[in-house]
Amino acid sequence: MGKRFVSLHAICIALLFMAVSCDQTFDPLQKNEDLTFSMYGVVDVHGQFSVVRVMPIGERLINTDPESNNSQVFLIHNSTGDQIAFQDSLYKFGGDTYVWNYFSSEDLSANSSYRFVAQNSEGRSSVAQINLPSELPIPTIEEYSTGFESGIFIGQSVDPIVSVKTRYFVQPVNEIGCDPEMEIVISHLDQLITYADGRYRLEVNNRSEISAALGPSVENFVINRRELLIVSSGEDWPDLSELIDLEITLPDVINNVEGGVGYVAGVAGRIIQITTPQEPC
């Protein structure tokens, strides 16, 4: 299995994004013999955000061992039995802290139920039941100004929109050339206007936020990519509105994993290129 470093944003775009603390330790008095894996992430109808963090449950949820544990991770369609293998991806937080993310770019059947399964070399497994939402139509870019980084997006969704963000790949420019590319992500869920018939509308004005993210020392910059990231979900999406932060971090509070801990949600996601991408300078 290959080691591939991927952006954590693909996981964080949805779900509590690693609701359980990365350094959370299980209670040594708690019986964990029946718990095999912790699993957090999303499975996407359109295959653009299907990434799930899968870690063997040991003393801690994450470890310092970059070697593969020979886990097999796959998705099974409950009606047809069709199976899709997820590929592994080693993610390094920094120092010697490693986690395993598993991803797939396969399109899936909307409004269908699946089982997300992680199995270790001894045959023990953890399973999450997932209900996928309807397909998410691609929204329309009604207008966009690259000068002000402002625009209007409109669309329609059968299921509630649970995440909407703009993402920019930006390079500061100095007198001798360009600095390394930076990723800037701005959430707009609070700005989203939704209607009873499923239509939605989003207006953004991001120039000042991009400048603030770059810092006062950056006077000039180029934007190589501008993207709209939008995600919908149905009954699978957890309701955290009545939970306090401490409750969210407890493994048994938000959990749909049998034989393990965690939460894997079904979503429909789209990544829309707002303007034509260009190569870094």
Q: What do these predicted regions represent?
A:
Residues 18-21:
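C-terminal motif of bacterial Sec signal peptides marking the signal peptidase cleavage site
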Residues 1-11:
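Bacterial N-terminal signal peptides that target proteins for export
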Residues 23-281:
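A sequence/structural signal for flexible, mid-protein segments enriched
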Residues 13-16, 275:
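Processing junctions and N-termini across compartments
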